[in-house]
Amino acid sequence: MMAVTPVRLVTLLIVLQLASPAWGHFTLPPLPPREEYGNIIMDRVSSREGQKPVVFPHWLHRARYTCRVCHGELDFQMKRGATEISERGNRTGKFCGACHNGKIAFRSNGNCDKCHSGDSGYSAGRFDEFLMKTSLPMAASGNGVDWSEGVRRGIIKPQSFLKKKSQDMAFDRQLLLEAEMAIIPPAVFPHKTHTAWLDCDNCHPDLFNIKRKGTHFAMEEILKGRYCGVCHMTVAFPMDDCRRCHPGMHE
């Protein structure tokens, strides 16, 4: 019988680690049904005031507008509950009221139940109809739509401003981000894909230091909703789709 020396034991452990799926090292959070992914329940004050919470379907809005319209021009914070939305503000043209004024979209007066449904799956039927009409490219996870590819192909052309035209910055630099674990190939970050939807200040400097390698982040933190996880856990494609960021990863 061959003796197991310390060197052989270490070698065996390395081989076993390389043979195991990299994502097996992380506990991925459970995902909602495809038709509910990206539907955010907003309940900062609604329940306290005896109203059903608002359900915000990102898919419905991102088909028409880029992220920067709400999370820039209209001052919606990325953090849930951090924006002091009120009925009074909406009726005076702030926040949701910037569009829901009876001209761009239905007005809030007399249409309370359209937003205050309290049911994250209320728009499931409309979502399926939308997919059939648009024929958007599909994705393996999230709500099943590759939104960025849909924009690249011109299938959808979301508007990037309401009144304040954004100053687009031509920056298409692609970053190669080395992973902390040797068995995981580098992540590829395409700026151009993100700037099609966002402004630079949506990420810099609050989420990421603008200096290269100035932000030290790990997958464990991303899975807690920090850094990339601010979007890629709730609205943008989730962490389950490993190869979207780590293209060198194998099954």
Positions of predicted regions on the chain:
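N-terminal export/targeting leaders of redox proteins
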Residues: M1-K52, N109-I184, A196, P247-E251
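Sequence context surrounding c-type heme c attachment/ligation sites in exported
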Residues: G38-T134, E180-E251
